[in-house]
Amino acid sequence: MLKKQFRLKKSSAFNATYRVKHSYCVSGVVLWVGSKKKPEYKQSATKVGFVVSKKTHKRSVKRNRLKRLMRESYRLLLKDGKIEGAQQFISLIFVGYEKALDKNFSQTKEIIAKLLLNLEKNND
């Protein structure tokens, strides 16, 4: 589980991230990117949110499974130090769609890694 300091929780924070309108999509998962951190806040943690809409699947078990897979994938990539490019942003939101529901853990981890790699490439 992600530590509290890394979690995006307030709806106002989610709305602020969506308002920036920068997104990347890979295999049914969309990454919404908030604005870049100001130089004085470079040491603060990047907040991350994981969303799967009720429109994606009516069963909460399926939705929560996808959120758990995305969350754990991000946590492991964070632990391995493979997401330095993402640390320059205030917030990130991963949104799962129907296409991603049937993916296993390794496929989900690969998708999250690709999204973060795209983010790093496009913001250098």
Where are these regions (language model features)?
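Positively charged, solvent-exposed patches that mediate nucleic-acid binding
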Residues: 1-124
